[in-house]
Swiss-Prot record:
Modification Phosphoserine occurs at: 26-27, 308
UniProt-annotated location(s): Nucleus
Descriptive protein name: Polypyrimidine tract-binding protein 2
Quaternary organization: Monomer. Identified in a mRNP complex, at least composed of DHX9, DDX3X, ELAVL1, HNRNPU, IGF2BP1, ILF3, PABPC1, PCBP2, PTBP2, STAU1, STAU2, SYNCRIP and YBX1. Part of a ternary complex containing KHSRP and HNRPH1. Interacts with NOVA1; the interaction is direct. Interacts with NOVA2; the interaction is direct.
UniProt GO molecular function: mRNA binding
Residue numbers bearing the N-acetylmethionine modification: 1
Nucleus found in the keyword field: yes
Gene Ontology CC: growth cone; neuronal cell body; spliceosomal complex
Species name: Mus musculus
Stretches that traverse the bilayer: none
Alphabetically ordered keywords of this record: Acetylation, mRNA processing, mRNA splicing, Nucleus, Phosphoprotein, Repeat, RNA-binding
Domain of life: Eukaryota
Gene: Ptbp2
Main location group: nucleus
Lineage, opening ranks: Eukaryota, Metazoa, Chordata, Craniata, Vertebrata
Amino acid sequence: MDGIVTEVAVGVKRGSDELLSGSVLSSPNSNMSGMVVTANGNDSKKFKGEDKMDGAPSRVLHIRKLPGEVTETEVIALGLPFGKVTNILMLKGKNQAFLELATEEAAITMVNYYSAVTPHLRNQPIYIQYSNHKELKTDNTLNQRAQVVLQAVTAVQTANTPLSGTTVSESAVTPAQSPVLRIIIDNMYYPVTLDVLHQIFSKFGAVLKIITFTKNNQFQALLQYGDPVNAQQAKLALDGQNIYNACCTLRIDFSKLVNLNVKYNNDKSRDYTRPDLPSGDGQPALDPAIAAAFAKETSLLAVPGALSPLAIPNAAAAAAAAAAGRVGMPGVSAGGNTVLLVSNLNEEMVTPQSLFTLFGVYGDVQRVKILYNKKDSALIQMADGNQSQLAMNHLNGQKMYGKIIRVTLSKHQTVQLPREGLDDQGLTKDFGNSPLHRFKKPGSKNFQNIFPPSATLHLSNIPPSVAEEDLRTLFANTGGTVKAFKFFQDHKMALLQMATVEEAIQALIDLHNYNLGENHHLRVSFSKSTI
């Protein structure tokens, strides 16, 4: 459950007398149709209901001790796991609310659960019990905002079909919009951090929670606002924009979720209403100095030649990369270096050339050294810190020659070449002037096609004389199974799917730059597509 931590404290069930104190009440046994509740001292909200025996089950629940800034969406989310929420009345001046569920059974389940597990909103325990009313009737003209939120959440829960609007006023909110956005980053050459997303999306309202993850070989995020209106504004303004100059394109849709469950505050997920959450996987928060420098650099203003208002100058992009991985880029005073330590290699199979080819998918490898006294480990020097971070992010934990490799940043600043005349058995190789570097040309399309290892490979530079069967046979000879193949229309490019990611890695190592004849050397990279 979102925002819930297990504690012993349990709210004492009682009626809504305290909630309604100071309001106009009818006698205990009379119809309460004329009751007026003052919600915040300024505006009045009419509430109609029927009196019930204190503590008896009801589908209308009374919630108290709410934080002052809590939103309707957060309160509604408390009830969603148990059934459909049919009405809500917020009494913000009293930090309390009524929540109506579709059935009494759902309300009983909810109360029973929260009697054992104290719910928290914004790091504050809240208390839930049955109200004295079996139905919640509100004047929608005086409760308009809550009704807008409730309609949006209900539509998402039942239809799960995101709609895009054309205006951003509250009255124009379409029913199937959630306060949670699903964000996909295309052409992600620079790392996009959780803090980058928070800075960008905070311009449209208070961001409550963010979760980042990789799915379908793409970096994605779920981001929750306190209000669906803010989510709509952000989607309309940011969908299709670039975070950095000519890359990192935002693809935004409304999520099917209406509330996010964040368990840890770290570099992958954050609940801004729960600063007490543990880091979980041990990842520390961003260094204050880096965070401050990043905030200063990234003004999110347009720059000449940029494709969108979100484009950020190169220095800011470098700062983002530094913030993401604490690595350095030329001209940026950030810690870290360009050298990676790769361990748990298959020492019988690995060579400097195979490491150059694999790590070269994510940057221009300068030098490779397999350690003389520990041949299952190697040092790899990339062209810059951003490339080393990308390679580490994408290759750590992948299988190469049957072993799961580990990739970390090294303490070394450079990879030393062996002294002249010293035979190191070919364990060290300098690739500084290699013609196979993918990223040496500024603005190369390779910058826009960096994806995690996948079973599907993208093939290019195929000569006209090479047929599908030729390529299938070629890739099958690497020891794997070709599951699918598809030529592009011009037959110069194709997609080829191996049985596993490990087989695809092996095929890429073996066949990238393979001579197909007619002065055509095959280009192989990982694809985000499937066949």
